[in-house]
Structure formats: structure tokens, C-alpha cells
Amino acid sequence: MKAESSSMAEWHASEGLRQRYALDEAKQGDASRKESVQDELTDTKDDPAAEAMGGSPSMVLGRTPDGRLFHVIDTPDMVTSIFRLDRPKAPLDILTLVLLLWQVCLFCVLPRKQAQVFFAVYFAFWRIMYNVGLGYVLTKQSRSRWIVRMLDSSGWLDACKNPRMHAWVQYHFKTKLGASSQRIAAAPIDFQAWILFRSVVDVILLNDVTAYAFFALSNIQGLGEHGVLLFVIRWLLGLLLLAFNAWVKLDAHRVVKDYAWYWGDCFFLCLQKLKFDGVYEVAPDPMYSIGYIGYYGLSLLTGSYAVLYVSLAAHASQLLFLVLFENPHMDRVYGERVPIAARVSERRPSDVPPATGVQRSREEIRTPQLAGAASAANGSYATSERGTAAVPSPPCTNVHDLHHRLFRNDNVVLSHIDLFRSSDFLLVLCLIYALSPLVLTRCGPRALLLFATIHAVAWRLFHSFGLGFALRWQSEERWIVHHFLKHYHFADGQAAVTESFSHWKTIYNTSLIMTYVSFALLAIRSYTSWTDNIYRLRYVLGVLLILVHMWSARSSYRVLGPFGWLYGDFFIDAYPKRLSYTGIYRFLNNPERSMGSAAFFGMALLSGSLTATVVAQLAHLSHWWFLGCVEGPHMRRLYGADVRQDSGVTKQLRQLCQSQWLRAAQPSIEELQGILQRAQGVVRQLLEQSRPRLERLADDTCALLQQKAEHVLTMHTGDSVQQIDQAKYRVTPVASPHTHEQRFHVGEPIIVQWMAAENHSRRDWIGLYAVNALDAHPDEHHGSLLVTRTTSRGKWLGVAEDEWEGHVHVGLTQSPLGTHGVSSVDTDTHQVSGVSVFQGSRLPWAAPGTYELRYHHDNTHYVLAKSERFTIYADSPEDPYSFDETFMILSKILRYALVEAPSTTSAAAHEYESADKADLTLWTQDQAQHIRDGIWSAFHVDFTKDVVIASANTTLLTRDILMARQLLSR
């Protein structure tokens, strides 16, 4: 249901079914806000509209979604209208009584076993009718007045359209309301629809509770095996719970009356002063929590586990009704609009320097800390590395900044897991190892050996290839740093580099340790008793290989230090880097190539296992790949000619190769080297080509899934389609007021003028298509008509936009055609014209390019008209490191993305007004997504919505863009 701004100003409530209790007068805003209503609601005593309507002060006013005020007619309660014999019965009341009497007769006639099965099924039917049926219908009514529009379209309330049903409805009103029915004709259709709806609710509710009661009675047990004392206690508690449940229901109805009991706020708003006491002071959501405690009272009385299980299921379904329908409905009708991000700065006048240059901030101009030499918050001056325009310092810290500095998508239980963060990586690792004993304790020796083998191989593959590819992409395109820049907000660029390197160090060290530990466990698990004659030699060689490996690793660390050992030169540019051929590197260029796997072969010799030997060979080959394809290219890229070609050992071997007895083998060796180099090149090329193909495959898969969710192609044949006069159809984008041509900036609303035959389908729609997508999926011809064979990816509008709910055409509102703008009818040419506006989520924010509009027939993909192709573009700065240019382009994107939603009240917007003009208030996730996509289109910097929300300031976002471009420009 669409609530008007005036209604929102008078009403503030939140989640709950048929209960509305008071908000705190100080408006301290409890986050739960369930089943609450403002204490000081507008009463007719103080409402001038009531006096203008000439009503009595005691009468209650109602307001329809379109703003119409009316006097709410008193209605009889359910017990009075249905069960009092002296009251006339409406047709639906008679149906209710017949169904209830039928249940009584069946309970008396059916054998006990059959009664148990029947009433279990019968209760499930009515419970589904309640939770699923009413939930679905009420959701549609809450969102789009579906019930009201159905009654209006069917003519049940119009004597001219449907006289028979109109007479039946009037008879129902007269019987149900008695003398008050004389005023029903003056009541709005929303109120009349509610009166009919509550009669249907009575049928469902009474049959639901009666079926449950008979199901419980059919399962009642006697004393059983527990004795008289427990039986008496069980019955006393059960009766007490039933009595308490009855009080909850009666007291709740006393407070909220029939209006909230029958979800009247789905139809209209009732303006009256309510005092929420009694049961509403006992528990939250009383109609959902303690309001169903009678289920457990009957379970105690019957002593049946079947009744208990059915009661739990029924109560759970009612809670789902609360979560899926009632809470969203209350948010729509009563919920205060709260932004997802609001950066509100408060400053003293003395803190505000004179405005200079572009009016983007009230702070003095400073130079950005893009080089990362000093913190952006220390207020010092520095010169930009690129010599660009001066950049204002970030605004002062406020609650928004403090929150996003302390909490950055931190992992809570298992939410927001990011395996690039070492803490999350270790958490997942701990969970896996904590759960593994559940499997291992039931495994035999062979299974344990298999597990140890898989365990060792998995760690080796992860260490060499998983971390290897990550390091390779980090070297080529700063992949790891880009991940942190994309997902987290940083005060300066060096903070992003430092944090990414910090997490890398922990993950790499953990992986390195686990690689050796997992292989050692495999060697122990696969150990076999030595029975050959050379076991002493194997023992000595194995220990020597392990000691050689330890000496080699220790010697390498002494030369490399922690920076080189942990591959710091892949991350940190400012750290002094130089090649030092001392220590073990005096003799070997890369000791790991020859001795990096010695420990694995040593442990394999000690175990005497073929399995361990094979895994050791795999480890050695994997590490060779890492050194050749990851570390080697990076060293050549970073140090160039400083990389030594020949080590001391290599020089001596080369001299040995000059001897005559080895010259004969030289051609074969050179040929083998050439083959290995070519094979390495082929593997490297394959890896480079596979990555973009996998990315395209993922994009195509996402596009296909989205296409399935859109319009299904409906292939009509016959004269009804072929005889359409396409000359009467036209669709044209109106030129942009900024460029004065059909050329639109990303995010700029596109006004579309369309023309159609007067008798065209109300299900016609207009799609916005990228030309490259149309070229990739050529159109299909069906007679004289084109059929679009690609998806609009959600970029479409119905010509009668208000008649659509998602992708489903409701087709009930007979309003003038057109959505935004005025439609007109040309009686001479028998054509109708209108205006539609593509804006917000209907625009391609992340994909500027050449586009085309297509007018489609009757909810199909038949093309009746096409527009001329036009351009959607995004400005880009001439100097990619200019603050002023970036700021101006970003401001344009923000202006389009932050167009205030229709439901945003001026009072809510004023509450989050900031002293800093650069501060942003984001109301929806869509706005953050549009800003993110616009930044990608204009600057080719990839952020997530979380970064946009964390910044919430034009100056900070500009800094983030410049920082990311500089860090990733390498």
C-alpha cells in the first residue's frame, strides 16, 4: 500500500500483527520497533478535517492511500455477528457456521484413528490458507492495493458493471453492518473492500482454530505411565496456559479493535488515539509470541507428542507470516525512512574557512597524500607526486567515520567471510580441522593413508598454485591490493597496501608451515618397517637431506630478510630494494630451485613409502613452476639487468662443459632446453588466455540467468500480429538538455516519446538495448515483424508503467496511458502518444556505449518500432590524477544517482542535512550501486558498495579514486 507523505507525517509505527503500541515520546528509536504506534496519534478531536466534515468528535477518521478522509463506520465484532442467534447472518457467516458444524459432526462420527488423520490434514489446509493464502493476498494489497483494484475491475461494487454481484455485496453489507450500512455507499472503495475481506478472514480463522482443537481432542491421552500426580500437574498447567491465551487475545482485541485485528492498515489508515497497555506491556509481538501459547496448553492437556509437533509447526508458520508479510508491511506503512549512510558533519563557524575554487568543501585546500608519505589526517602539507591541483583535506571525523573505521565488514559468526583476510582464513581453517575428527575417527588404516595423501597434496597445490597465481597477478596488476581497495575504505593508499601485505604475510606463513607439516604426517602415516640391507644408508641420507634443507632455508633467510622471504617486493614500492649476492647466493642464484625440496625427499626416504616419494616429486615440480612462472618473471620485471645470469656453481659447470668429452652431447642438451622453453611458453600463454575466457563465461552465465528472469518470449502467430500497422508506432528519445542531442551522460534520465495505435495492447513495453548485445544475438524475422533475441537486462518500461508488478502485468488500473508525462489521443489518426522516462535502475550505469530503444507488442519480444541509435557516455578526466577534474565528474554522477526517491519526506532529508556540502546521504542500496557503477564507467576503478557507503563524501570518494588509480597504475 502506498502511503502518502501526509500519512507518514502523522503515523510512525513498525513491525507487528494487529498490534500498534507507542513509540517513545523522545523518539529515541528502538531498533526493534515491533508492534508500535505513536502515542500522540492525530485524534478527530484535534483534527480540523473532522470539523470540516461535520463529524462528531467521538467519530474516528480514516484516510485512504489517495488522501481521502472519511468517517470509519462502527463494525460488530466476530463473536457478535456470527454466534449471536438474534443477529442476522450474512452469506459468509452462514458458510462459516456450516463448516464449523460439519467439523463437530465429523468429530462425533469418525473413529479416533481416522479423526486424528483427518483433522491433522484439515488443520494443515486452513493453516496454509491463513499463512500462505492471506499472506500472499495481503502482501499484494499492501504493495499495490491489489484487492481494491480487483474489486474495482470486476465491478462488484458498481451496479452498472456487475449488477448481480453488486446486489449480493450490498446485501452482505446490510446484514453485516445493520443500520450503519446506510452510510457504506458514501465510504471509499478501500473501506468497502476491507469489510468484504474481514468476512473471508473470519471463515479462515474460525475453521483454523476449530480444526486444531478437534485434532488435539482426537489425540487426548489418559493417565498413561506417569501416575496421577503428573497427570494433575499437566492438566493444571494446560488449563492455565489456555486461560492466559484467552486473556491475551481478548486484551489485544480491546486495544487494537477490529481495525488492526483484520489488517485494516493494508486498506486505509485509521486516525485515532490509542493507549497500548495490558498485554502490550507483557511481551513483544504478543499476538505472535504469547498469543499462541494455547497451542502448548492443549499439548499438555492431551499428553500427545503428535499435538506438540503440530503445534510447533503451526507456530513456526505463524512466525514466518510475521517475518515475510507483517514486518515488511509495517515498514512500508509506518517505518521511518532511515538512510543506509549519512555522513553528517557539525562545525563551528570559526572552523569554516572562506570558500575557494570549486564549492566542494568548507575546509582549506591541501595537497593529497597520494604518495603515502604521511597520513591524510595529520593536516600537514605535501606536494603531489604528479604535481596536480591542490586537494582539500578530508572533513572532520564524525559518527559515520568512526563506525566505518572500527567496523569494516568484520566477520560475525560466519557472515562477511573474506579469505583474503588472514583472520577469516585461519577461522575457516580451524573449523575444517575441528570437524575432521568426526570423519577420521571412523576411518580404517587405508582410509587414513588416503586422507593424509590428499591432505598433503592439497596444501602443496594451494601453496604453489593458489598462492602462486595470487602473487603472479599481484605482480602484474596489483591484484591483492586491488581486492582490498575494492572492498574496504582506507584513509590513504599506503594503508591499503600495508593491510593487504599484512594479511598476505600471515596466510603465506601459515601455508608454508602446513605444507611441511602435512607432508610429515603423510610420511609418518605411510611409514613401513625397513627390511632391506641399506636401511642405515637411507636413514643417514634422509636426515642429511632434511638438515641440508634447514641450512639452505636459514642461509636464504639471512640474506633475504623478512622482506624478501615474505615477497614484500610484490607489494611495497617504497622499501629499499637491491640484489645482494652474498651468503649462499654467492654460489647459487636461487637455492630453492636445487635444495628447496630436499626435506620432502628426506622424509620420503625415512618413510620408505612410494606414496610419499611420489608426493615429494609433485612438491618439487610444483615449486619449480612457482619459481619459474611467478618469482622469475617478477625478478626480471623489477630488477631487469641486475639479475645475475650465472651463479658461481654455474660458471664452474660451464667450464666443465667446454671439455671435449662433453661437446658431443651439446646439441642434444640445447635441443632439450629449447623444447623446455617452448613448453613453458605454451603453458604461460594458455594460463594467460584462460583467465579472460573464464571471466567471459561467468558474465555470460550471469546474463543468461538474468534473461530467464525477464520476459519470456511469447510466440504468437496469426493475423492478430501480422496485421498490425507498424506505421502507427514510433519510439524516440528526447535530446538531452545538456548536450542538445541524443547523447546522454551515464545516469542521466532518458525521456522517451512513444506513439502507438489507439487500440494497442496495454501490455506493450519499451526496452533499452546495447547495440553490441543486439549484434551478438541477431534478430529473428517472423513474417514482417522482428523478434528481439537478447535480454534488456532489466532496462525496460511498460507504456502503462503503473499497471506492472515486476515482470507481471496486473492490468487492472484503467488510468490514462503513459507513465511520466501526459498522454494524448489523436482521433484523426487513431493514435495515442505518451512519455516514459528511463531513470535510476532502468539505466545502464556500468556500460556506456551505443544503445537503441525498441517498442514491443503485448508483453512479447515482437518489435513494432525502433529508435535511432544514440550514445550513453561517461566523462573521463584528461589528467587521470587531477583532483578537480575527478571531483567535477564524480559530482555529476552523484547528482544523477542521488535523485531523491518519491517516498523521501522533506523532514527526513532535513534531519540528515550536513554542514559539509560534500557529505552524502544514501537512502538505498540501489543508490550506492549506481555510484559504484558510475565510478567504474568514468574512471575504471572498481569499488564495492561498501566502500561508497563508508566514504559517503564527495571529497573522500575523489581521494579514493585517485589513490586507487595511482596504486594500480603500475
UniProtKB/Swiss-Prot annotation:
Ranges of biased composition (kind: Basic and acidic residues): 24-48
Region (Disordered): 24-59
Membrane association type: Multi-pass membrane protein
Gene (UniProt): CHO2
Described purpose of this protein according to its UniProt entry: Catalyzes the first step of the methylation pathway of phosphatidylcholine biosynthesis, the SAM-dependent methylation of phosphatidylethanolamine (PE) to phosphatidylmonomethylethanolamine (PMME).
Family according to the record: Belongs to the class VI-like SAM-binding methyltransferase superfamily. CHO2 family.
Protein name: Phosphatidylethanolamine N-methyltransferase
Keywords from the UniProt entry: Endoplasmic reticulum, Lipid biosynthesis, Lipid metabolism, Membrane, Methyltransferase, Phospholipid biosynthesis, Phospholipid metabolism, S-adenosyl-L-methionine, Transferase, Transmembrane, Transmembrane helix
Segments passing through the bilayer: 90-110, 117-137, 200-220, 228-248, 282-302, 305-325, 425-445, 447-467, 504-524, 534-553, 595-615
Top-rank taxon: Eukaryota
Pathway: Phospholipid metabolism; phosphatidylcholine biosynthesis
Catalytic reactions of this protein: a 1,2-diacyl-sn-glycero-3-phosphoethanolamine + S-adenosyl-L-methionine = a 1,2-diacyl-sn-glycero-3-phospho-N-methylethanolamine + S-adenosyl-L-homocysteine + H(+)
Main location, first listed in the record: endoplasmic reticulum
GO (cellular component) term, any one: endoplasmic reticulum membrane
Source species: Malassezia globosa (strain ATCC MYA-4612 / CBS 7966)
Residues on Lumenal side: 1-89, 138-199, 249-281, 326-424, 468-503, 554-594
Cytoplasmic side: 111-116, 221-227, 303-304, 446, 525-533, 616-970
